[in-house]
Amino acid sequence: MDIPFEEGVLSPSAADMRPEPPNSLDLNDTHPRRIKLTAPNINLSLDQSEGSILSDDNLDSPDEIDINVDELDTPDEADSFEYAGHEDPTANKDSGQESESIPEYTAEEEREDNRLWRTVVIGEQEQRIDMKVIEPYRRVISHGGYYGDGLNAIIVFAACFLPDSSRADYHYVMENLFLYVISTLELMVAEDYMIVYLNGATPRRRMPGLGWMKKCYQMIDRRLRKNLKSFIIVHPSWFIRTILAATRPFISSKFSSKIKYVNSLSELSGLIPMDCIHIPESIIKLDEELREASEAAKTSCLYNDPEMSSMEKDIDLKLKEKP
């Protein structure tokens, strides 16, 4: 639609000849004139010829570019919109992978974690025990009932359940097992108590070292040291006797006087009640073998005794042949 102009249509060259705009409004003019300008013809070609948008003639110099940021119209929040067109499908995929990389910590997993770790206080210091790594060795310490009057506990320590020293994580296992033994001992003992150390059926590679036993003794609470009435070692070997002899310099004479050696389970039953004491099968088998070997040795000594008459030997043989 053609729009008539009162002064005529201005050409692009005439726009440069416009008079300067007034600095004040003429409020006395009752019929102000409105001038409308038409856009110049623009060549949309990509070459830099005259009239093209890439031409240097259309580029404003830095002095001519004067933009007042405060006077620019910005869209309101209501006028804004989100572009939901061609989205990158990999963006959603990456965000989904990031959300899946951190799994939710469920209540069941929290309970399971509490079962795998136990927090104890030993020597006024809080310690954490890796219960998973010592699970196969928890039978090393057990409650064997009571003796005498009151709550005099019998604590059974079975060395045959100790870990093998050939394990790659042997020191880590023994460290956690040490904390478990000490904390369990404090829970089991209320008054006086005794320790029954089952040394039999334990290969050399499973025997605890001198440093480990020394640390156990030093970490035991003073109350537990005082209330310990007896330390019975069943089936003692020359190795355990040597270990205890080496520990005498740093243990008290009172503790040394509490150590007793017992060579058989029958001898142990004459000292304490055996009803609640769990004896491993390997130790029971060893005890039978030692008893048979002892009887055979006695018989051999009797037959080799020159003072024993032939009549006494015949009587002894007849007694053994009777059912």
UniProtKB/Swiss-Prot annotation:
Protein name: Protein prune homolog 2
Record's keyword terms, sorted: Apoptosis, Cytoplasm
Function: May play an important role in regulating differentiation, survival and aggressiveness of the tumor cells.
Polar residues bias (residue ranges): 40-52
Chain intervals with Acidic residues compositional bias: 57-67
Chain residue ranges for the region called Disordered: 1-67, 79-110
Swiss-Prot/TrEMBL GO biological process terms: apoptotic process
Location of this chain's protein in the cell: Cytoplasm
Cystines in this chain: none
CRAL-TRIO domain span: 130-291
InterPro entries: Bcl2-/adenovirus-E1B (IPR022181), CRAL-TRIO_dom (IPR001251), CRAL-TRIO_dom_sf (IPR036865)
CDD domains, alphabetized: SEC14
Cellular component GO terms held in the UniProt record: cytoplasm
